[in-house]
């Protein structure tokens, strides 16, 4: 099974560059604007798109992404709406990989089998579920793989050599390395430490390793992209979106452009990095 994610990384490897992975929250600040933002991302330079599934208790997320989730929930966004956004995006773009990221509870309530069928039909390529450890693989990971979706696992600075094989066992698509301990948007990533961590993970897997948390500038994106197969940016994009909203947290004429302009700037940073020697 070759997914859009596999195809995209193969293309990027031929080009000798790393992936630029963007994260935005579904339904932030409303569904119509959210779709416009999603459609603007590939043209601005996003290689892979992660879409946050709004949830009431996002324990791993920092203030920016928590606020984005609340704006989305207040606008009425549900998991069904999130899948609808992917479906609408796919009407114009059948190549950019789309990964849903979030927590298990909304999927459990939706129903695992129904969710996987609907996600696949909508055009979702992979899942990142931050609160399902490998010990729970039978809940969602294995059924997702059977449905043809990549299940992307998080590794962290505290994932030691003993734990890493379990983390990687049923991972596919790519490995998401969380470069700092703590919540999203909280600190800056250290590219030297990231390089060591990526090398350690790659001793255990042939999968691409993407690095997220703590990347906010083109310079930081370039430094991380030189060490990894991809750089993931979320909080900085959500900050840019939030700053473009009016006093009532409604979208303005500047909202889509504010996100797209930052994506273009960060993408230029990623493209300026030389892929680390294999």
Curated annotation (Swiss-Prot):
One of its GO terms (cellular component) is cytosol. Pathway: Amino-acid biosynthesis; L-tryptophan biosynthesis; L-tryptophan from chorismate: step 5/5. It is an enzyme of class 4 (lyase). Its EC number is 4.2.1.20. It catalyses: (1S,2R)-1-C-(indol-3-yl)glycerol 3-phosphate + L-serine = D-glyceraldehyde 3-phosphate + L-tryptophan + H2O. The keyword Magnesium does not apply. GO terms for molecular function: tryptophan synthase activity. Signal peptide: none annotated. PROSITE patterns: TRP_SYNTHASE_ALPHA (PS00167). SUPFAM superfamilies: Ribulose-phoshate binding barrel. The active site is at residues 50, 61. Pfam families: Trp_syntA. Keywords: Amino-acid biosynthesis, Aromatic amino acid biosynthesis, Lyase, Tryptophan biosynthesis. Tetramer of two alpha and two beta chains. Belongs to the TrpA family. The alpha subunit is responsible for the aldol cleavage of indoleglycerol phosphate to indole and glyceraldehyde 3-phosphate. This is Tryptophan synthase alpha chain. The lineage of its organism: Bacteria, Pseudomonadati, Pseudomonadota, Alphaproteobacteria, Hyphomicrobiales.
């Amino acid at each position: 099974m070759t997914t859009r994610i596999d195809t995209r990384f193969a293309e990027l490897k031929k080009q000798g560059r790393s992936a630029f992975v963007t994260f935005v929250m579904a339904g932030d600040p409303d569904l119509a604007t959210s779709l416009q933002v999603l459609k603007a991302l590939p043209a601005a330079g996003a290689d892979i798109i992660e879409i946050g599934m709004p949830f009431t208790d996002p324990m791993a997320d920092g203030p920016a992404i928590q606020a984005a989730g609340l704006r989305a929930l207040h606008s009425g966004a549900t998991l069904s709406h999130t899948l609808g956004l992917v479906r609408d995006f796919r009407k114009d773009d059948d190549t950019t990989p789309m990964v849903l990221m979030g927590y298990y509870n909304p999927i459990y309530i939706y129903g695992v089998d129904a969710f996987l069928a609907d996600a696949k039909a909508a055009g979702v390529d992979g899942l990142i579920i931050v609160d399902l450890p490998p010990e729970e693989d039978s809940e969602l990971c294995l059924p997702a793989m059977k449905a043809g979706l990549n299940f992307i696992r998080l590794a962290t600075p505290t994932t030691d050599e003993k734990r890493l094989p379990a983390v990687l066992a049923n991972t596919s698509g790519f490995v998401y390395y969380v470069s700092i301990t703590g919540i999203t948007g909280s600190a800056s990533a250290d590219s030297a430490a990231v390089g060591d961590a990526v090398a350690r993970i790659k001793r255990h897997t042939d999968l691409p390793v993407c690095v997220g948390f703590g990347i906010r500038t083109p310079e930081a994106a370039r430094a991380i992209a030189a060490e990894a197969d991809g750089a993931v940016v979320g909080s900085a994009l959500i900050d840019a979106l939030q700053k473009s909203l009016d006093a009532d947290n409604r979208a303005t004429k500047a909202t889509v452009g504010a996100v797209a302009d930052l994506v273009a700037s960060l993408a230029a940073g990623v493209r300026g990095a030389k892929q680390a020697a294999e």
